[in-house]
C-alpha cells in the first residue's frame, strides 16, 4: 500500500523540524520538506545583489531584500510542487514565514487537509492573520487567541523512540528565548518550584550577553 504524503513547512529554528520529520515517517508518512526553502538566503547572482543594494541605499526601499527572498522562495517551492505533483496533506508550523502566494499555490496541490499550528502568540507574528482562511484547520497555542476560526492545541511530544528511556532526573524542562512579556512569569514559577523542591531544567537564550539578563532570572535557570 502506498504511503500517504505530507508536506512539512516550518522554521529552521533549533532544527526541531528534523524530529518532527522523523516522527511523521515513524507514523507511516512520506515527508516532503520545504523547510530549507526559507532557512538561508543567498543572492542568486551579483547583479541581483547590486540591484537590491541600489534599491535599499539609493531608493530607500527597505523591503527590497524581503521581496527578493519571497520571490526566490516561491519559485523554489513551485519547482518542487511541479515535480512531485499532489500531496495528501500539508502541515505547517508558523505559516507566516511563507509568502501568501506560496501558501495559495500549495493549497491547490493538497488532496486532503492543510493544517497550521501557530506555536507563538498571534500578536507576535501578526502577518499570520491574513493566512488563516487558507487552512482547513488552524491550531493555536495561546488560549487568548481562540476564536471561531482557530482551534486550541498545547505542547506535543515525539513517540518514535520511547524504548529504554532513562528515568528523568528533573521534574520540568523548558527551553526558549528571553521575551520581556514572559520573563516575570518564568522567574516566578522557578521560585515556586524551588520552594516545592521541584527540579528544573530550564534554559533561556539571551543572545550575545547572557550575563546582562541574569537579574531577571533565579540561579536555577540556565542562561545561554
For the regions a language model picked out, list residue spans one by one.
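Nucleotide-sugar donor-binding catalytic core of glycosyltransferases
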Residues: 2-52, 69-75, 84, 119, ...
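Short, structured active-site "lid" loops
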Residues: 51-65
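Internal alpha/beta domain cores that form substrate/cofactor-binding pockets in large enzymes
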Residues: 65-72, 100-102, 110
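Short N-terminal targeting/anchoring amphipathic segment
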Residues: 80-97
Amino acid at each position: 500500500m502506498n504511503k500517504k504524503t505530507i508536506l512539512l513547512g516550518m522554521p529552521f529554528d533549533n532544527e526541531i523540524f528534523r524530529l518532527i520529520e522523523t516522527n511523521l515517517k515513524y507514523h507511516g508518512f512520506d515527508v516532503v520538506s520545504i523547510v530549507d526553502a526559507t532557512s538561508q538566503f543567498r543572492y542568486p547572482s551579483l547583479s541581483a545583489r547590486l540591484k537590491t543594494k541600489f534599491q535599499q541605499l539609493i531608493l530607500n526601499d527597505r523591503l527590497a531584500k524581503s521581496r527578493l527572498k519571497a520571490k526566490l522562495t516561491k519559485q523554489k517551492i513551485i519547482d518542487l510542487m511541479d515535480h512531485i505533483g499532489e500531496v495528501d496533506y500539508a502541515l505547517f508550523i508558523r505559516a507566516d514565514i511563507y509568502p501568501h502566494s506560496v501558501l495559495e499555490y500549495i493549497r491547490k496541490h493538497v488532496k486532503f487537509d492543510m493544517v497550521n499550528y501557530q506555536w507563538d502568540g498571534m500578536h507576535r507574528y501578526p502577518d499570520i492573520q491574513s493566512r488563516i482562511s487558507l487552512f482547513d484547520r488552524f491550531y493555536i497555542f495561546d488560549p487568548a487567541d481562540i476564536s471561531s476560526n482557530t482551534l486550541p492545541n498545547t505542547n506535543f511530544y515525539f513517540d518514535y523512540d520511547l524504548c529504554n528511556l532513562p528515568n528523568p532526573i528533573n521534574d520540568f524542562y523548558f527551553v526558549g528565548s528571553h521575551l520581556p512579556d514572559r520573563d516575570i512569569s518564568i522567574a516566578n514559577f522557578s521560585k515556586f518550584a524551588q520552594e516545592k523542591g521541584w527540579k528544573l531544567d530550564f534554559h533561556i537564550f539571551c543572545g550575545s550577553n547572557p550575563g546582562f539578563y541574569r537579574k531577571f532570572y533565579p540561579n536555577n535557570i540556565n542562561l545561554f
